[in-house]
Amino acid sequence: MLVQAMTFEGDAAGLGVAHAIGQSTATDRRVLVDDYTRHVINDRFLALTRDAQIKTEAEATWAMFDALVAAGAQLRITNPVGANPFAYARRNHKKLLVMDDVVWLGGINFSDHNFAWHDMMLRIEDREIADWLAGEFDRDWQGRPQAAAVSFADIELLSLNGSDNETGFAPLIAAFAGAKASIEVISAYPTFPFVSAMAEAAARGVPVTLYTPRPNNKPVIRDYLLGMARASGLSIRLLPEMTHVKAALIDGEALVVGSSNFDFVSHRANAEYVATISDAALIVDCEERLFAPARAASRETEPDDHSVWRGFWAKLGLRAADVLIAGLGQPKRIAEWRRP
């Protein structure tokens, strides 16, 4: 049993997952949690909050991890921030479960607020794929992740280490820019260079639609997207509830899912998993479960949603953040669990 997440909190959702891991009879029980969880609880920076409830949940999280180790599971922390607060920007963003010959990959973290959001994981039953992803998990476990790609019958898997992402993402960005019939994307946080590539397709007359939540926990992204739409011809449709799904459908023939938000942080710094699927039956299933409901529930933007100034400042701020992250070195990759 191999478990990897960026967020793993000591609330009802996280404790339920931890209990299942602790009770498992698997001989190999390993858990990777990003150092994000030692700094952010319930979307609140621990160093910046005086909220007693958040502090209590943090203590419950540390106790949960201690109990996991006491139950015989192994636990390590990815990308520890250490003494450099700027290292926080480089995260291991992967979400993965490997259980014998079955794997799940996608966007789901283990916390109540994440469980409350619309989200998805792709379940794959295949020994070869499970073995390959277990190998990638082990690279992260050893603190030696590498950029890697592999093709199976109808799925291409990409494992990104946060250092060589520009090369790894190049085929996906080219696929967005070169789309011929349509692009549909569900994501709360898409930005350049992915959105810029989609805009290239839109400039050629290809219909490009992005479904993104109106109640976004990062509203600057919504402002950026609305500003881009005015300048590029992208269609932005707002969903009534928060979604954490990361999915793209290109020309109705290629389904892209995984942990990547299709954003500059993913492109620049995050360790990620991305799957590109050509299986027609699975694409039809995702069309019915994801894209058709998004089309039905979403609404066109309204005049009050748009602000030239908000769009300008959002784009400027995100570009500045990209420059900052580009100048950061790669932090230490792995550490044994210990309380903050």
List each language-model region with its residue ranges:
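Structural motif
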Residues: 2-6, 104, 184-189, 214, 256
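HKD-type phospholipase D/PLD-like phosphodiesterase module
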Residues: 7-178, 211-254, 260-267, 271-275
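An exposure/low-complexity boundary signal
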Residues: 150-192, 301-340
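Redox- and metal-dependent alpha/beta enzyme cores, enriched for Fe-S-associated oxidoreductases
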Residues: 196-197
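Helical hairpin unit composed of two closely spaced alpha helices linked by a short loop
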Residues: 200-201, 206
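Long, C-terminal catalytic modules of enzymes
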Residues: 253-255, 260-340
